[in-house]
Amino acid sequence: MAQSVPPGDIQTQPGTKIVFNAPYDDKHTYHIKVINSSARRIVYGIKTTNMKRLGVDPPCGVLDPKEAVLLAVSCDAFAFGQEDTNNDRITVEWTNTPDGAAKQFRREWFQGDGMVRRKNLPIEYNP
């Protein structure tokens, strides 16, 4: 059963943070790549700390072993210096899919007994 095996590693490009550059009077989009470097199929979901300012497309999906997906992280226009951006980040959550399951995202796979792993990517805003 896949749920008893801890999920393997993923890689992200960039690996540690996402950087947006001023001006912030228009929407910015930054692409990141998520790679399933494990030997099992995983399901992933992306969370943001500021849903008003940050968006991710696609926000969830399923990746086969060694498969990658390109995500568009968007930052809507905002008043730089007048809003708190210190804690902005996106979090990639992932877990193994059950053995024999269809390659289709299911939210309940995150709510079962299996381990869910997380990787935080802080957002840096350059003035």
From Swiss-Prot:
Residues 9-126 form the MSP domain. It is found in: Cell projection, Pseudopodium; Cytoplasm, Cytoskeleton. It comes from the Eukaryota. The keyword Nucleus does not apply. One of its GO terms (cellular component) is pseudopodium. Around 30 MSP isoforms may exist in C.elegans. Keywords: Acetylation, Cell projection, Cytoplasm, Cytoskeleton. Its main location: other. The modification N-acetylalanine is found at A2. It comes from Caenorhabditis elegans. This is Major sperm protein 55/57. It holds the Pfam family Motile_Sperm. Central component in molecular interactions underlying sperm crawling. Forms an extensive filament system that extends from sperm villipoda, along the leading edge of the pseudopod. Sperm.
